[in-house]
Amino acid sequence: MSTNPIQPLLDVLYQGKSLSREQTAELFGALIRGEMSEAAMAGMLVALKMRGETIDEISGAADAMRAAAKPFPCPERNNNPLHNGIVDIVGTGGDGFNTINISTTAAFVAAAAGAKVAKHGNRSVSSKSGSSDLLAQFGIDLTMSPETASRCLDALNLCFLFAPHYHGGVKHAVPVRQALKTRTLFNVLGPLINPARPEFMLLGVYSPELVLPIAKVLKALGTKRAMVVHGSGLDEVALHGNTQVAELKDGDIIEYQLTPADLGVPLAQISDLEGGEPAQNALITEAILKGRGTEAHANAVAINAGCALYVCGITDSVKAGTLLALATIQSGKAFELLSQLAKVSGEALVNGQERGR
């Protein structure tokens, strides 16, 4: 008879049965603490994948990872009457398209337009250049301390939180994920475990089948308001076709579709949004933020920033949000913000504030 306390939970999964939210949190807690063998980890992830993860199981895994995360000292949420919450603009990755860095660039635009954006990101999943790869090109320190990141959020309306810096326990799963060579629950967990605990989210998913389930997970996790989107193959709001949406608002979830026309912009081709290596994508992002990007690039960023501005209540419609985002892009304010963030990041390193992290 096994003395391993998690073995009975694994046995439930191996029988094709579901775990409760609490049971899943217990399993993932063991994984994060390094108390699960790689064989058991692989068995757990495959068993969940083959049956299909439930809302409770995804929520429980997120609970465990949130609880184990390095704390993030959020700026006082109540000291500013205009500051009614933090928003994240994030995608699962894994959509298979090598696009420009839409959500990362949109984060600068939304912040310059007045949103408080704490973007949780990692290195590339589906493209040649993930959010962290891009930021490194601009000299933004990926591992700035939580205190420095919090100051950036307070002063500049924006910070970037590098996932491995806050979720050290995930390293135990890396060899297994690489060996399995298939999507697992970890592919959807990243956007759910932002240590800033954003009240608002624009969350893109790689599959249309995930849109409603992930909206239900966000509701279970206590997210105040969100749009979960899949845009004609992309984990973003689409410029090249329809976007499937599940919007969480006031505890209810409504499903609908958005077209580029609904957002006030013309249709474009997916090929117009093709990205490259980090250095090339950095030049593209810089051009967009200076108001000198191509129409398709500017519009793709604006519709995503616009939906984030709508979700956090700065505008009362996605179309109004897109118009505000386009005006912000043309003003050059978003590029000024990027320059300020890089400056603060560099000063923190020079002053030694990032030591002893």
Curated annotation (Swiss-Prot):
Upper taxonomic lineage: Bacteria, Pseudomonadati, Pseudomonadota, Gammaproteobacteria, Alteromonadales
Subunit relationships: Homodimer.
GO molecular function annotations of the record: anthranilate phosphoribosyltransferase activity; magnesium ion binding
Cofactor: Mg(2+)
Name of this chain's protein: Anthranilate phosphoribosyltransferase
NCBIfam families, per database record: trpD (TIGR01245)
Annotated binding of Mg(2+) 2, by residue: D235, E236
GO process annotations (BP): L-tryptophan biosynthetic process
Keywords: Amino-acid biosynthesis, Aromatic amino acid biosynthesis, Glycosyltransferase, Magnesium, Metal-binding, Transferase, Tryptophan biosynthesis
Organism name: Shewanella baltica (strain OS155 / ATCC BAA-1091)
Residues binding anthranilate 1: G91, N122
Top-rank taxon, per record: Bacteria
Binding site for 5-phospho-alpha-D-ribose 1-diphosphate: 91, 94-95, 99, 101-104, 119-127, 131
The protein's Enzyme Commission number: 2.4.2.18
GO CC terms of this entry: cytosol
InterPro entries associated with the record: Anthranilate_Pribosyl_Tfrase, Glycosyl_Trfase_fam3, Glycosyl_Trfase_fam3_N_dom, Glycosyl_Trfase_fam3_N_dom_sf, Nuc_phospho_transferase
